[in-house]
Each structure stands twice: as structure tokens, then as C-alpha cells.
Amino acid sequence: MDENKQKALAAALGQIEKQFGKGSIMRLGDNRAMDVETISTGSLSLDIALGAGGLPMGRIVEIFGPESSGKTTLTLELIAAAQREGKTCAFIDAEHALDPVYAKKLGVNIDELLVSQPDTGEQALEICDALARSGAVDVIVVDSVAALTPKAEIEGEMGDSHMGLQARMLSQAMRKLTGNLKQSNCMCIFINQIRMKIGVMFGNPETTTGGNALKFYASVRLDIRRTGAIKEGEEVVGNETRIKVVKNKIAAPFKEANTQIMYGQGFNREGELIDLGVKHKMVEKSGAWYSYNGDKIGQGKANACKYLKENPEIAKTLDKKLREMLLNPENMQLTGETASAADDVEFGAVPEEF
């Protein structure tokens, strides 16, 4: 760039910063804060699949799946992890179904958790926006998008048609929220439900509620599914769960995490540590015996998990080693083409090799 252009650019940048404040425009290479801060989801497998060690601060996240697949459990695990880091969390319970006893079992400090049970969708989104603008809240969870009922629908008759009303409400909310969340570095998680499209002959008939705006504004979209039951004898004690990252703007998308959600306990962290440790040769498996650093830790996976639960320091060390090994900076490199392609991905339409 010649000298005159450089002077003109410097003057323009100076004028913009004077008018709109420092940091309103910058060179991309100068912004060292571009490294995204994340909060752990509570599942090591999912943190690794996300490629950044957790869900990103200052962004919108969508978690969707069928009923009883673990959507609310995942958000409560994340709230517990955020509270352990001293962060303030809010739960906007549009479904009016939050169980404080279950939340406490998962490690949530219910005395510090902010909870709102709004009457209308507009009220829920206004509360969400006010919390984001305050700059004092770090994580907001909205449960769920399907329960955000527009005021006109609540005040109308049961048979009235309100075509596109919820989608318009959400579209406007996304436009307002995105900038406020970024400025206050607050994460907003929307839990969503699945619906079936009528008359779809080919392709996946599943879709999420609330129109398309949320799909585009979300930096991360997670598809969570129950794949099987975990039994102790005849009693079912948990779910085998698969979580697919169908959109990711902070790392490479389309990765999957397979984990277990135990009833009343949340993620089976010790089981994940054992499985990933064996896979990456940090835990030795000989027959039914598991060993770590040359010491036998249990016969059978259940006993090895029990050992890690009784020795949290060893579990913490193994977790740290696995994160250092698997969360490489290369995983964070994402081309613009990949990010924009991820905007258009419909879950179920992802090639099997991913």
C-alpha cells in the first residue's frame, strides 16, 4: 500500500475509533482475544469432539434432540462446570419443568442459580436480552424454544392460526441478542425439540422448531440422541448417548461423541476416561485388568471406574493428559468455507464418513 493510502486509512481508523470507541475496528492479526474462551460440557468426549475443549463464550449454542435424550442434563452439567469456575448462570425455564433436586445431584449450586419461569415467549427473550446486556451473567440457558409461545397465541382462542409468529419473534430476538452476547462475553444456550415435516418423501423429515434464524445465528449446534440402555441386572440405570456436532464455527464440524448418562448422576466421566485412556494407550488393558502407570486399578471397567472415583487426583491427572494430547491447536483451524457450509447442514444429511 502506498504512503497516501496508508495515511488515509490511519485517519479513517482514528475517526472510527473516536466515534465508536476503541476496539470497534482492528486488524484481524492484532486481535489476540480472538482465541475463544470455552466452558467444559462435563463430558471429556464431547469437549474433544467440539475441538476447543467446551462450548464457546459470547456465542449462541443450540442443543436439540428427541424427548428424554439428555438435553437438559447436558446444560445442567455445563452450568455446574461454569459455577465451579465462579461464573454466574441463569436458567430460563419456559417449559416450567426444572427439577431443583436433580440439578443439585448434578453439582449445580441451586442457591446461586438464577431461574425465571416466564409467561410468554417475548417475556423470556426480553429477560434473556436484559441479562446479556447487564454484563454480569456468563451463561444463560433457555429451555426450550418450542415452549416460547408468542403473547398473541396465548391471548387468542385455541383454534386460531398463528402462522410464522414464533419464527418472526425468534428472528428479531437473534438479531438483538448476538451483539449483546458478544459484548458481554455471555453464552446463550437454546434447547430445542424435534418435529416431523409433513409430505417429505426423500431425505430426513426431521426439523427443529422456531424457524431458520436460530440455525444461522448459532455458532455450535449439537444433535443429542439416546442409542441404548445401560443395565445392572434387569434394572435400567442409564442411557448410551451419541452427540453429533452438526455445526461448529470454532473448530471442524461433524464430529461425534459417544458417552453414557447415568440416572441421577449425569455423565459417566470415569467411564470416558477409561475408554479414551485405553484408546490412546495411557491406560493399559490386559485381559479384564486395567492398569495406569504400571499400577493395577481394577478388574473389569466397573471396578476401574470405581477406583478413579475414589482417587479424584489420578482422574484429574489423566483428564489433563488426555486434553493436552487431543486438543491440539490444529483442531482450532477452520476455513471460512467449512464454517459457511456448516450453516446449511441439516442433521441426518451429513456423510457417514464424518
From Swiss-Prot:
Coiled-coil regions listed in the entry: none
Entries under Gene3D superfamilies matching the protein: P-loop containing nucleotide triphosphate hydrolases
The UniProt record lists the keyword rRNA processing: no
Keyword flag Membrane: no
Binding site for ATP: 65-72
SMART domains: AAA
A single GO BP: SOS response
Domain of life: Bacteria
Protein function: Can catalyze the hydrolysis of ATP in the presence of single-stranded DNA, the ATP-dependent uptake of single-stranded DNA by duplex DNA, and the ATP-dependent hybridization of homologous single-stranded DNAs. It interacts with LexA causing its activation and leading to its autocatalytic cleavage.
Listed name of the protein: Protein RecA
Organism: Vibrio cholerae serotype O1 (strain ATCC 39541 / Classical Ogawa 395 / O395)
Organism lineage string: Bacteria, Pseudomonadati, Pseudomonadota, Gammaproteobacteria, Vibrionales
Gene symbol of the encoding locus: recA
